[in-house]
Amino acid sequence: MQKKSIELKSNNFTLLVLYLNNQNIDLINQSLYKKIQECPKFFKNAPIIVNVSKLCNTVDWKKIKKIIISHGFFVVGVSGCQDGILKKNIIDSGLPILSERKNNKSNIITNFFINSYKNKKKETINKVEKTHIIDIPVRSGQKIYAKHADLIVINNVSAGAELVADGNIHVYGIVRGRVLAGANGDTSRKIFCTGLFAELVSISGEYWLSDQIPSEFIGKSAQIYLKNKFLTINSLS
């Protein structure tokens, strides 16, 4: 039997979702710039969905779209749009309106929010003061951030959950969510886990999605770190 030339199938992809919680275009531009500076390699050329549920129809959508694209993102669609006029403006700009499912948290890498732009003192990259220990399961939709600290999880991490630490991350259990170590830019940090099924792993902005993790390490004990600016993975056994 001859194989079909093309096939259309449903699938799940892990994408960034950008929530616009403010109508001020200059503020959005400043906040995007600031966010990208935190992890420029992580966000570079990233495909994203833009959530506009907080925007009204008077906003200059074409300008917002232009600003987002100017920061290096690829907008694949728009979600959360309930206003007819805004919806028409979005469609006229060449972007599709996407419907959201109730369990869409499992398909989000990280939600980053545009609320307000606040100047903060630059933090020392290698400043790790303490260790956070979590001994209960980390559920889908939960996000744990260990600021200036290592993070140790002595339990399982569900799909759709997110672990973030400025230091190292240790997971003594099965990890199916997202794991981001060295979040403040420290390239010496590592990820250790005993059951690797992660949706995403990242060290200082360098990341692998689940399908980029070498298959021989899936479900195994592993350590992940940066070597010559590239992600490297080794067995712990």
Swiss-Prot record:
Annotated Gene3D superfamilies: 2.160.20.70, 3.30.70.260
Keyword Cell division carried by entry: yes
GO biological process: cell morphogenesis; division septum assembly; regulation of cell division; regulation of cell septum assembly
Top-rank lineage group of the source organism: Bacteria
Keywords assigned by UniProt, alphabetized: Cell cycle, Cell division, Septation
InterPro entries to which the protein is assigned, alphabetical: CAP/MinC_C, MinC, MinC_C_sf, MinC_N, Septum_form_inhib_MinC_C
Keyword field contains Cell membrane: no
Family: Belongs to the MinC family.
Functional note: Cell division inhibitor that blocks the formation of polar Z ring septums. Rapidly oscillates between the poles of the cell to destabilize FtsZ filaments that have formed before they mature into polar Z rings. Prevents FtsZ polymerization.
Self-association state and partner proteins as the record states: Interacts with MinD and FtsZ.
Protein name, UniProt field: Probable septum site-determining protein MinC
Naturally occurring in which organism (per UniProt): Buchnera aphidicola subsp. Acyrthosiphon pisum (strain APS)
Gene field: minC
